[in-house]
């Protein structure tokens, strides 16, 4: 708990058995009240590792629902548990849990209702092992998205996010895609609803065990991001109604 607000960390997992313990051990339990681990039918020992670590809230999908579908389960459970602040952290150890207090503080003190852990903010992305092609693609996509969505974010593609309860109760994230594009749809929804988005610089860590989507899926994801941004702008101009927005 921080400033009297309950903090729940959600871990959307897919074959995270090799990195889950390292991630979990760094979670600051002096402020984190609950952890929810959702295994998206990955087929490895993620749930067994979670049980050995003492994670109380373990959920396994009977079939693979996709990255977005996993997040939907995570957020529903966090809200059910009475979370005031929900922090989504990938259990592949690409993002350091040590930033949870900073992100939670920004939400708890009403400075920002949405906070992103940005790998691009600062100069550590390439030093941390982010492939050059992904770095360039990230920068180009973010530039285009900032233009269409009228923001100045350093990246939209991080898997490290904090939301206030009000945010998740105000937008229709349940209507979003079950795929990777969920992340960009929920950002567009947050902006459309008038929620300010803050960022903290997060060290980049790419290594063999960390999860990553392949080139084909990355291309599909990139096109999807552009589609979300264009639909957002057309919606704001009143030209074409985007059903995910109000």
Residue ranges and their predicted role:
Residues 39-47:
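A conserved acidic beta->alpha catalytic loop
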Residues 83-92:
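Short beta-strand-to-loop acidic/aromatic patch adjacent to the donor-nucleotide binding site
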Residues 4-7, 28-37, 56:
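Short loop->beta transition adjacent to catalytic acidic/histidine clusters or analogous donor-positioning motifs
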Residues 41, 66, 94:
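A short, conserved beta-strand element in the Rossmann-like catalytic core
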Residues 61-63, 67-80, 97-180, 207-226:
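Acceptor/aglycone-binding surface of glycosyltransferases and processive sugar-polymer synthases
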Residues 16-19, 42, 96:
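Donor nucleotide-sugar binding loop of glycosyltransferases
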Residues 1-3, 150, 174-246:
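Hydrophobic helical membrane-anchoring modules
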Residues 14-29:
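Short, well-formed alpha-helical segments that are part of the catalytic scaffolds
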């Amino acid at each position: 708990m921080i400033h009297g607000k309950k903090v729940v960390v959600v871990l959307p997992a897919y074959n995270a058995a090799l990195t889950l313990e390292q991630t979990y051990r760094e979670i600051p339990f002096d402020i984190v009240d609950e952890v929810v681990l959702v295994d998206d039918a990955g087929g490895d020992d993620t749930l067994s590792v979670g049980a050995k670590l003492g994670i109380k809230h373990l959920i396994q999908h009977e079939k693979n629902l996709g990255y977005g579908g996993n997040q939907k389960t995570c957020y529903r459970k966090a809200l059910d548990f009475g979370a005031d602040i929900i922090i989504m952290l990938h259990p592949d150890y690409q993002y350091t849990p040590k930033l949870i207090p900073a992100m939670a503080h920004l939400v708890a003190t009403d400075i920002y209702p949405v906070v992103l852990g940005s790998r691009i903010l600062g100069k550590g992305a390439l030093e941390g092992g982010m492939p050059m092609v992904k770095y360039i693609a990230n920068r180009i996509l973010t530039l285009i998205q900032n233009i269409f969505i009228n923001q100045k974010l350093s990246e939209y593609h991080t898997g490290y996010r904090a939301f206030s309860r009000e945010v998740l109760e105000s937008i229709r994230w349940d209507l979003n895609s079950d795929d990777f594009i969920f992340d960009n749809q929920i950002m567009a929804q947050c902006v459309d609803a008038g929620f300010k988005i803050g960022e903290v610089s997060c060290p980049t860590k790419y290594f063999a065990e960390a999860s990553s989507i392949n080139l084909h899926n990355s291309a599909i994801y990139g096109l999807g991001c552009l589609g979300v941004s264009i639909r957002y702008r057309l919606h704001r101009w009143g030209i074409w109604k985007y059903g995910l927005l109000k």
